[in-house]
Amino acid sequence: HAKYIGIWWEMHIGISTWATGKLHAATTQNTKKYIDFAAQHGFDGVLVEGWNTGWDGDWVKEGGLFNFTEACPDFNLPELSAYAKSKGVYIIGHHETAGFIDNYERQMQDAFQQMETYGIKAVKTGYVEHGSILNNGKYHHGQAYIDHFRKVIQLAAQHKIAVVAHEPIKDTGERRTFPNMVSREGARGQEYNAWSADGGNPPDHETVLPFTRGLSGPMDFTPGVFDISIPEKPDNQVNTTLAKQLALYVTIY
């Protein structure tokens, strides 16, 4: 299984942002640093969140503004794609929809074609929402979303792109037909350690997941956080040890 690192955790702990501006994380310069690290330490891919336009403002409520082919002005996709390839690494795309699936479906063909053109072999999709009914009045696990997920993985397969879905629907065996549906989240993830009011996931959280969530199929949990303390968030920390973070690469896949 491929391992990847990415530009995401630094936003959750508050040292950078998805939105554009002085603290924007997904810049050409910062992404090159991650690519260099990945190449040096044997990681296959580099996930980049916040690379595209639409993150400024209240994106959870305004997800219809996301553009999945237009990069932010300080993110040079062609340059970074070529740079990653020269280092033996590939960029992993990020398509956060905030649950606005109609907006995503209108752009998917162009978005996946762009990814294939630039050698982006995988995409992390996202459907962040608050509550079971989304802004478009549809249920997260309703038929509209079931149909949508099938469209995504089918179109991605045509462009030879692997899908890792966050805020997904339940795994029901689609990956037997579409093996590019590599993994999905579907559990309380690592990011809760950065900002949850209850202080983060309890130490036994990851011991339970393989025997509960893991029963339905592969799980994307984003392990590998070694800076356990979070100076920017004194009431939070990653409730773990370094050995445990490494072990999660084996016990959760």
Predicted regions and their residues:
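Low-complexity, polar-biased intrinsically disordered regions enriched in Pro/Ser/Thr/Gly
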Residues: G14-A26, G137-Y139, I230-V238
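Aromatic- and carboxylate-enriched substrate-binding clefts and catalytic-loop regions
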Residues: G50-P231
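Generic structural signal for residues positioned in beta-strands
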Residues: Y4-G6, D220, V250
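Glycine-rich, aromatic-lined ligand/substrate-binding cores of catalytic
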Residues: S229-Y253
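Conserved structural scaffold segments of CAZyme catalytic domains across common CAZy folds
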Residues: H1-K87, H95
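Alpha-helix initiation and N-capping motif
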Residues: A2, R175, P218, K244-Q245
